[in-house]
């Protein structure tokens, strides 16, 4: 892909947008920048990084009317809007940073492991990256997990990697056509981002774009949407918590198996919860697909300590355990967290619901939860969806109040679980900030 003499508008000026500007400028493009709202301080900050950069704000259509060949979109901006559809119909091209990286790795021959899913993708990405590094591969971990892929590429100054381990969101896959992963997985599909997609099937179709090419497909055999993503003529590895598969959990023994072969006991895996058994199986399958030896992978799994804010025990007071799952930002993630914990629960839910249906939590909560505490802007909707199923629902103004009230009701042996099933931006700077407030509230008890 050549950018010489191409006029490109980069839309969205967060980390991904900045990395696209830097990469495209380095490769000879004439680049301008757009954001719907731009403060003078932000313009000055970015202007110091890129001399002579032209900025546009306001209506995207007005910016696009300036003769651009390509629109480079940050993931937060949907291309499903009339201005962008008209741009494409008039011959304009729309792409994102993953498409730009795909062009690089396709030419250079780098291997790629690509990971998406409604839940678990960050844990699996981190675990796969950890295993690749431990096995001696020159590994780049990037994408939705934090480091924009083009920022990572620029830092490497064009050096080929043994493997790129990419966490990809559905937003990033919307305008990615050329990525051909060596191995890829969709961990699961549950309600998320339905404010952006027509329905759950539309969302699942977007996730399935990760399987372009002829690489190994790693599929969740327990998920009806994932099972349907199998493509003809491809090598497929399936994992299951429910029944025998290529990789599966033998419930009676707590052993992960490959066919009839014992792999590792769940007692030897530091990650808590059944959902993490699925994460481990997917990670091992992905790593084997790029040629890493199983024996070494299983030994390194035993030393992976997981990620903060994901079903993480933060402390205990008078026998009451407090667990942080602030990264549980949708119904599926929260249901998985609840399913993986055995003790009676007091669960804190709420925030920005993103158009989700919370009724699936009724079954997840009814046999385990002694109480549910609701916070945030969509607390009323969660109450409506859970009402009448026998749960004790309590509205709280703040997260601190929810922690205090839950602790007051809990007994030794109970768990207070923060797993909101919602985004955090109505009350917090992000899920990490929400976690910090939860931890401080626990310490203040």
Curated annotation (Swiss-Prot):
Keyword Cytoplasm: yes
Binding site for ATP: 117-123
A molecular-function term among this protein's GO annotations: UDP-N-acetylmuramoylalanine-D-glutamate ligase activity
Protein origin, superkingdom: Bacteria
Signal peptide boundaries: none
Reactions catalysed, as given in the entry: UDP-N-acetyl-alpha-D-muramoyl-L-alanine + D-glutamate + ATP = UDP-N-acetyl-alpha-D-muramoyl-L-alanyl-D-glutamate + ADP + phosphate + H(+)
Cellular-component GO terms for this entry: cytoplasm
GO biological process, one term: cell wall organization
Enzyme Commission number(s) of this protein: 6.3.2.9
Functional pathway: Cell wall biogenesis; peptidoglycan biosynthesis
Main location: cytoplasm
Subcellular location: Cytoplasm
SUPFAM superfamilies named in the record: MurCD N-terminal domain, MurD-like peptide ligases, catalytic domain, MurD-like peptide ligases, peptide-binding domain
Keywords from the UniProt entry: ATP-binding, Cell cycle, Cell division, Cell shape, Cell wall biogenesis/degradation, Cytoplasm, Ligase, Nucleotide-binding, Peptidoglycan synthesis
Cross-referenced Gene3D superfamilies: Mur ligase, C-terminal domain, Mur-like, catalytic domain, NAD(P)-binding Rossmann-like Domain
InterPro entries: Mur-like_cat_sf, Mur_ligase_C, Mur_ligase_C_dom_sf, Mur_ligase_cen, MurD
Disulfide bonds: none
Family, per entry: Belongs to the MurCDEF family.
UniProt function note: Cell wall formation. Catalyzes the addition of glutamate to the nucleotide precursor UDP-N-acetylmuramoyl-L-alanine (UMA).
Protein name, entry field: UDP-N-acetylmuramoylalanine--D-glutamate ligase
Lineage: Bacteria, Pseudomonadati, Pseudomonadota, Betaproteobacteria, Neisseriales
Gene that specifies this protein: murD
């Amino acid at each position: 892909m050549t950018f010489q003499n191409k006029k490109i508008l980069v839309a969205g000026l967060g980390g991904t947008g900045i990395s696209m500007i830097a990469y495209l400028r380095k490769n000879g493009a004439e680049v301008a920048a757009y954001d719907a709202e731009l403060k003078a301080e932000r313009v000055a900050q970015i202007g110091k990084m890129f001399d002579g950069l032209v900025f546009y704000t306001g209506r995207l259509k007005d910016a696009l009317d300036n003769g651009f060949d390509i629109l480079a979109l940050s993931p937060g901006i949907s291309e499903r809007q009339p201005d962008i559809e008209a741009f494409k119909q008039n011959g304009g091209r729309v792409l994102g940073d993953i498409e730009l990286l795909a062009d690089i790795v396709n030419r250079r021959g780098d291997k790629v492991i690509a990971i998406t899913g409604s839940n678990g993708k960050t844990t699996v990405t981190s675990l796969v990256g950890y295993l690749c590094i431990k096995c001696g591969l020159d590994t780049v971990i990037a994408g939705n997990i934090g480091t924009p892929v083009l920022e990572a590429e620029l830092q490497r100054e064009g050096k080929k990697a043994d493997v790129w381990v990419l966490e990809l969101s559905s937003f990033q896959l919307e305008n990615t056509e050329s990525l051909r992963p060596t191995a890829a997985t969709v961990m699961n599909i549950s309600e998320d981002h339905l404010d952006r997609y027509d329905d759950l099937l539309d969302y699942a179709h977007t996730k399935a774009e990760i399987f372009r090419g002829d690489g190994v497909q790693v599929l969740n055999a327990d998920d009806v949407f994932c099972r349907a993503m199998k493509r003809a003529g491809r090598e497929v590895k399936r994992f299951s918590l429910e029944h025998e598969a290529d990789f599966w959990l033998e419930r009676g023994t707590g052993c992960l198996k490959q066919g009839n072969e014992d792999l590792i006991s769940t007692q030897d895996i530091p990650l808590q919860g059944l959902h993490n058994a699925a994460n481990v199986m997917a990670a091992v399958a992905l790593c084997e697909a790029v040629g890493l030896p199983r024996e070494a992978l299983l030994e390194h799994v035993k030393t992976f300590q997981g990620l903060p804010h994901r079903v993480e025990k933060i402390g205990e007071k008078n026998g009451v355990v407090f667990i942080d799952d602030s990264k549980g930002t949708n119904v599926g993630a929260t249901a998985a967290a609840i399913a993986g914990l055995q003790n009676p629960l007091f669960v804190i839910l709420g925030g920005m619901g993103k158009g989700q249906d919370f009724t699936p939590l009724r079954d997840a909560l009814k046999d385990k939860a002694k109480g549910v505490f609701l916070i945030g802007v969509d607390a009323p909707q969660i109450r409506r969806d859970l009402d009448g199923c026998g749960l004790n629902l309590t509205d709280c103004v703040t997260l601190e109040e929810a922690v205090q009230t839950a602790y007051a009701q809990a007994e030794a042996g109970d768990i207070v679980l923060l797993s909101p099933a919602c985004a955090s931006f109505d009350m917090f700077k992000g899920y990490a900030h929400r976690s910090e407030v939860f931890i401080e509230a626990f310490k203040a008890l």
